[in-house]
Amino acid sequence: VLIIAVLFLTACQLTTAETSSRGKQKHRALRSTDKNSRMTKRCTPAGGACDATTECCILFCNLATKKCQVPTFP
């Protein structure tokens, strides 16, 4: 009886560990996809056309001229 109880508890632990590791794997895959999407975003260089949805490279979008430009400080 003791051997059967030990085998049952071991099987329960293995089943629980397997399902929880699958859940973690899904999250790892999502994090990897997020990281890749952040790394592949492109930005518009100085003088390039832009609008409210465009990302300028370390610059800002002048909506009046619709061009990316470096901020000027007085």
UniProtKB/Swiss-Prot annotation:
Keywords: Cleavage on pair of basic residues, Disulfide bond, Knottin, Secreted, Signal, Toxin
Chief localization: secreted
Propeptide position ranges: 18-40
Disulfide links within the chain: C43-C57, C50-C61, C56-C68
Compartments where located: Secreted
Highest taxon of source: Eukaryota
Leader sequence segment: 1-17
GO MF term set: ion channel inhibitor activity; toxin activity
Similarity comment text for this entry: Belongs to the conotoxin O1 superfamily.
Protein name: Conotoxin AbVIK
Biological source species: Conus abbreviatus (Abbreviated cone)
Taxonomic path: Eukaryota, Metazoa, Spiralia, Lophotrochozoa, Mollusca
